[in-house]
Amino acid sequence: MSRLWGGRFRKETDPLVEEFHSSLSFDRRLYAYDIRGSIAHARMLGRVGIISAEEARTLEAGLYAVLDDFNAGRVAFSPEDEDIHSLVERLLIARVGEVGKKLHTARSRNDQVALDVRMYLKDEIDAVRELLAELQHTLLDLAERHIETLLPGYTHLQRAQPVTLAHHLLAYVEMFHRDAERLADCRRRTDVLPLGAGALAGTVFPIDREYTAAELGFAALAENSLDAVSDRDFAVEFCAAAALIMVHLSRFCEELVLWSTAEFGFAEMDDAFATGSSMMPQKKNPDMAELIRGKSGRVFGDLQALLAMLKGLPLAYNKDMQEDKEALFDAVDTVKKCLMVFTAMIGTVSFREQAMDRAVRGGFTNATDLADYLAGRGVPFREAHEIVGEIVLYALETGKTLEELTLEEYRRFSAAVGEDVYAAIRVEHCLAARKVHGGPAPETVRAAIARARKRLERV
């Protein structure tokens, strides 16, 4: 088979090189984008008179026929096809004859592949953002059912202050909202047409890049031909955004793994999202949460692979850039799969409200409120903090909770304590008093859920 670039060479390529050089095993997923881009390019060539209108129609019909063959699974892949671009061109020429060789006029594989990857990534960004929206809806539905469900908030994995399960879930809604915003920003920078840049220096033909951009739905044109073919920032940006999505999923999964232990007992995974042990019959393992947590490392690796690949490249295109696709494709596939599994899983988790309630009431989570109570009675907060620390130590030594201490015991530490202290340190009061925007008070959480739902309507 003749090569797209074979005229310069006397010797055949070494078979080992052919295998090493080929990207068809992974870039074949771009076939629909490659064909769509070629159809738009053929139309443009005919529109401006670089080829005849009849030739343009022949190319377009041939390309649609090739697309049908791909969709129907009728394409036979050859080891001699270097990549999806050369395969599509070979199939087109076999179908329409010599006119097929005119398709590549005013185009290089350098701007062609940049186009394909951008088109692919725009669609995948939209798909990931939709999955993020579905996850946020699921979390909001869950939060709505748990506005009053007490949960200890933690710092350093030590019980800290009372919150609610709804408030905790809303923290992740905010993370996934930021993820969606990052992807929207990435999409804007991906939505730039590189076609027309040629190999690196544009073309002498009077092409109409604006027409091609409109045909393919691009918002802008690449402003510099060198940058157009060498830019993979958009792929790096996506992988960085995907890595953060995986960080957020991994953190949530870590909590689910912890909460599902007997030591915490806050949650139980549904049977459909857990597995057992081949040896220990009592086990119910949160394997899906652990797998998502583990797969985060893959996406971090994909990001690092892209950065390492790009860091030493001179302008413009270099063969190293063929390595962008496997990392990008893996990041896309992994984050989509993890989002789908996590959304299905989190909606089935059983939360143990009594265990959470006991943990809130048994860990001095209302100590800060006791300090605030003293500060409200004129005791300087730093002094109030010291006093409450001493009270907690005393309660630990006597085996009591703050609610179980007598007024006489309290007054050994501060005369500012009155009978109303017991109302002030009730966990329910501690929550209800935190009505600040973004706080865990039930009425504040209800408003936050409503705002988050409204925000999702605009996505």
From Swiss-Prot:
GO terms for biological process: arginine biosynthetic process via ornithine; L-arginine biosynthetic process. Its main location: cytoplasm. It is found in: Cytoplasm. Pathway: Amino-acid biosynthesis; L-arginine biosynthesis; L-arginine from L-ornithine and carbamoyl phosphate: step 3/3. InterPro entries: Arg_succ_lyase_C, Argininosuccinate_lyase, Fumarase/histidase_N, Fumarate_lyase_CS, Fumarate_lyase_fam, Fumarate_lyase_N, L-Aspartase-like. GO terms for molecular function: argininosuccinate lyase activity. PANTHER family: ARGININOSUCCINATE LYASE. This is Argininosuccinate lyase.
